[in-house]
A protein has these predicted regions:
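Charge-rich, well-structured scaffold segments of protease-associated domains
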Residues: 1-40, 108-109, 113-256
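His/Glu-based metal-binding/catalytic segments typifying zinc-dependent metallopeptidases
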Residues: 39-98
């Protein structure tokens, strides 16, 4: 497999080091005899057949906690387009410690040590998920709070205060984002992978500074419709099933 697939043609090597270019290049001379082009991979992703609005229950006997995931397929990754703007939209809902979801489930209710939501995308596929590990006896109540928060944000949108906090938080975080060697490596890899110019950072800063409340609310309505989502719960099925069915959802047993 490695002889056929792992070849250097078309690859790029990125290094962040205190070595000069000549010394670093010399140290990589061991790779000079590695030649060739790997066979192409034909990748395809099957369509999901899950039922939206249902709960898929994975049993773990006597679990003290339940893991909840609520989500759907979503966008592939982009750098300055709708995917990036949607990550800004999600910030107030589930992308920060003081997001609505975390303040509700952790700080107010005490159901979990942390709850969050996020978009995750690659070149071929993407998804949106809201997730937490919660006390087993609060599984049903946690789902209710998740759904209420997502639905409220989708329908009523972001507040002025949340928009300002998002802008300040993202800008402050980005100011330190490329300080470490590992971060610099990731920065360069991102430029090469997406064929970017280094000023994409400035482009993102402009988006953060100028995205409007109306734009964010349109994205929330478009991407956070709970009727388009399904739920996965991992926990003690014999105690959870009656609770989950009492919420009015169809519950399907699922094995991994």
């Amino acid at each position: 497999f490695y002889q056929q697939q792992v070849k250097p043609f078309g690859g790029q090597l990125i290094a962040v080091s205190d070595l000069g270019q000549a010394e670093l290049t010399k140290s990589l001379s061991i790779l000079e005899n590695w030649q060739g082009k790997g066979a192409g991979l034909q990748l395809s992703l099957p369509e999901g057949n899950g039922k939206m609005g249902a709960i898929y229950l994975v049993n773990k006997d006597d679990a003290a906690q339940s893991v909840i995931r609520i989500g759907k397929r979503s966008m592939t990754q982009d750098i300055t387009g709708e995917y990036y703007k949607s990550s800004l939209m999600n910030f107030a809902l589930g992308g920060a410690f003081n997001s609505r979801i975390n303040l509700n489930l952790r700080e107010d209710k005490g159901y979990t040590y942390g709850a969050r939501s996020y978009f995750n995308g690659g070149k071929l596929s993407g998804y949106y998920t809201a997730t937490a590990e919660v006390r087993a006896d609060a599984t049903d109540k946690s789902i209710v709070e998740f759904i209420n928060e997502i639905k409220d944000y989708s329908e009523r949108g972001i507040t002025d205060e949340e928009l300002m906090f998002m802008r300040n938080s993202i800008n402050q975080k980005d100011a330190l984002k490329y300080e470490t060697p590992r971060a610099k490596l990731g920065f360069l890899a991102q430029i090469l992978e997406h064929d970017l110019t280094p000023d994409f950072v400035n482009q993102r800063s402009e988006i953060v500074a100028n995205i409007t409340k109306a734009e964010i609310n349109v994205l929330a309505k478009k991407h956070l419709a709970v009727d388009d989502m399904l739920m996965v719960v991992v926990g003690d099925a014999k105690t959870l099933r009656p609770q989950l069915e009492a919420l009015g959802y169809e519950v399907f047993d699922y094995q991994i």
